[in-house]
Amino acid sequence: MMLDFKKKKELVTQINLIAKTALSIVVANPQGIKSNDITQLRKLARKSNVKLGVYRNTLLNLGIKNTPFECLKNILIGPTLIAYSSEHPGSAAKLLKNFSMSQSSNPNFKILGAVFEGKAISGSNINSLADIPTFNEALRRFIIIAKEISAGKLLRILVSIKNIKENS
């Protein structure tokens, strides 16, 4: 579909707004993906508050100019699907990582890379971004560790009391 100059300008403005509000952006190559699979990916994205978009590379390059995501220019080759979230930096990476694992029948779907805090992350190192725990996950881990430490201290105190009573 041919876009007129006005629509292209609106898209560049929209991409620039995305680049200013997103915590991280993940870029993937959607070539060869069936429309049913893309629809499924969009449903999963809505559930995890991740936004998806397919944009032309020239418009993306113009939209990310003078933003922390400018280092994406080296990654933008061929068809481009971007995923981003303004709530959690790892949610888009986690979504695309899980989707690429489920697409074992389609080897064409590849995560090209990502940008987090102004630094480019290659597609092979996307796990470092995808494994960042959410606030709730981190809180759960902290509580579990705190409980284990408390239980361990209590156990040591009880053992020392038992030893003191046995020795006296």
Swiss-Prot record:
GO MF annotations in UniProt: large ribosomal subunit rRNA binding
The record's annotation in InterPro entries points to: Ribosomal_uL10, Ribosomal_uL10-like_sf, Ribosomal_uL10_bac, Ribosomal_uL10_bac_type
Q: Which family does it belong to?
A: Belongs to the universal ribosomal protein uL10 family.
Q: Name one GO biological process term.
A: translation
- Tell me the PANTHER family matching this sequence: 39S RIBOSOMAL PROTEIN L10, MITOCHONDRIAL
Tell me, in a sentence or two, what this protein's role is.
Forms part of the ribosomal stalk, playing a central role in the interaction of the ribosome with GTP-bound translation factors.
Name this polypeptide is given: Large ribosomal subunit protein uL10
